[in-house]
Amino acid sequence: MSLIPSIFGGRRSNVFDPFSQDLWDPFEGFFTPSSALANASTARDVAAFTNARVDWKETPEAHVFKADLPGLKKEEVKVEVEDKNVLQISGERSKENEEKNDKWHRVERASGKFMRRFRLPENAKMEEVKATMENGVLTVVVPKAPEKKPQVKSIDISGAN
């Protein structure tokens, strides 16, 4: 473990290393300019939220999207369809109001906006999209149109035999 803290992101993070846990550090910010430390921390927190992770799987019946959005209410999330085949998931978490007399020791929860867009294949039924949100997980289901089977017509073969 380094004795000199990094201005580019703080400490190591390894769940298997008991010395890398985020413990209270009386010297945090002492060796770095406070503005650099604040900017690195803020950038890291905002980046964690703005890069919302989304899983996309395809089943025989539908395209299913799942996004982890902990702490967001369904009113803070939008699911939209644009250009007939683009699914857009967006949202915003507002920063908590600060009181003049409050003394913050640590701010780790991220705030900001996020937006993810997915271009879906032709077989997506965009007019039937359904979205649910439960326990901070947004699930969007886009049904698929049934596959069109080609019509096959048998042709009799004429000739001498």
From Swiss-Prot:
Q: Keywords, A to Z?
A: Cytoplasm, Stress response
Q: Name one Pfam family in it.
A: HSP20
- Annotated sHSP domain ranges read 45-160
Q: What triggers or suppresses the expression of this protein?
A: Accumulates after heat shock.
Q: Does the keyword Cytoplasm apply?
A: yes
Please give the biological process terms from Gene Ontology that the record holds.
heat acclimation
- For whether the record's keyword set contains Cytoplasm, the answer is yes
Q: Which residues form a coiled coil?
A: none
| Gene Ontology cellular component terms for the protein in this record | cytoplasm
Domain of life according to the entry: Eukaryota
Location relative to the cell: Cytoplasm
**Which family does the similarity line name?**
Belongs to the small heat shock protein (HSP20) family.
Quaternary organization: May form oligomeric structures. Binds to AKR2A.
Name of the protein this chain belongs to? 18.1 kDa class I heat shock protein
Q: Which organism is it from?
A: Arabidopsis thaliana
